[in-house]
Amino acid sequence: MANDQVILLDYWPSMFGMRTKMALAEKGVKYEYKETDPWVKTPLLIEMNPIHKKIPVLIHNGKPICESLIQLEYIDEVWSDASPILPSDPYQKSRARFWAEFIDKKFYDPSWKVWATMGEEHAAVKKELLEHFKTLETELGDKPYYGGEVFGYLDIALMGYYSWFKAMEKFGEFSIETEFPILTTWTKRCLERESVVKALADSDRIIEYVYVLRKKFGAA
Amino acid sequence: MANDQVILLDYWPSMFGMRTKMALAEKGVKYEYKETDPWVKTPLLIEMNPIHKKIPVLIHNGKPICESLIQLEYIDEVWSDASPILPSDPYQKSRARFWAEFIDKKFYDPSWKVWATMGEEHAAVKKELLEHFKTLETELGDKPYYGGEVFGYLDIALMGYYSWFKAMEKFGEFSIETEFPILTTWTKRCLERESVVKALADSDRIIEYVYVLRKKFGAA
């Protein structure tokens, strides 16, 4: 694996890219990072992900792997000698996959609509977002990490969104620390890991970016 | 595994349930089938899938596994001695997962909207559906099965929709056999398998069901 060529096409604010960066760091995989604005659609992005033309794309020895959750599975399988990402038990694995899918299917939409909408729609979206935070906190329960004692797949899947939490709080007018203390303790625990901290974007820079997006989406 | 208790909560027209039935049959797993109308939300369904309250739910020794693609992975891992479902190579596995996700993220919506919409929306949906069929045919290429020489994960993921093909053709006013001959040859190849044939619902019964749904959705 020493001569592997690993490239990550990613865009700095992407919660999905942050996941992949965490996983690569957990495994100690060195890679070349290529900043790729997904609004631009560079020839390399189109070549590597012709179907969705989205980042992140992980390119391993010339072969593209698309979609962040699929990348986590791939990274875990290929670099299997370092810290495992997915649980080894099939049932625990199915639960981790279920909740990661929940995050992208249910949590994702209100997580950005909370800063992109106004009025009645905003109120409905905020309510939904808070419900999903609650659900995710309940699923964590009193475990240190989602998978139990060890940081892994579902922690990565949700911590990918961490850089966006402050923007959600600002435009949603709520405090994660006040409303979800257990989840907050968990985020602090995850933030003790270098793999997590180094992968995350600065929360204030995300807020500046959100102002740009709000103009783009006509919400400001 | 001989004393395993396996229950499948499923509803006969579900393309997702048909996938799981195919996978269980491929592995030779015996199970109890419990017909579960997802519009009704039985106490057992709510208990086993409290988040989405959707079928299919695979219950293995009392533990629920939700979401059909996650079930395929689970079945492949737990009953690993019989015919493999996923490719063993991590890159091929990532491709199979990518395309299965494409089917549910992109193909699914137009696959039902083609019989649930009218007028301009219908025309747009039909165009999209045909494009996705073309994309899926191109991905198959000249391979006998999606994974190569052996029937597996992505074949199951797409063949789950087969019982609905006739309804798509009828309300979309197109012929899969004429437009997508390579895909048609592949469906015929898959239909030679008992695991597939036994899992599928009758296409004409699906069309009758579509008439019921069209009334429900106000499209008739």
UniProtKB/Swiss-Prot annotation, chains A, B:
It comes from Arabidopsis thaliana. In vitro, possesses glutathione S-transferase activity toward 1-chloro-2,4-dinitrobenzene (CDNB). May be involved in the conjugation of reduced glutathione to a wide number of exogenous and endogenous hydrophobic electrophiles and have a detoxification role against certain herbicides. Its EC number is 2.5.1.18. It holds the Pfam family GST_C_2. This is Glutathione S-transferase U26. GO terms for biological process: glutathione metabolic process; response to cold; response to herbicide; toxin catabolic process. Glutathione binds at S14, M15, V40, K41, K54, I55, E67, S68. It catalyses: RX + glutathione = an S-substituted glutathione + a halide anion + H(+). Residues 89-210 form the GST C-terminal domain. Residues 4-83 form the GST N-terminal domain.
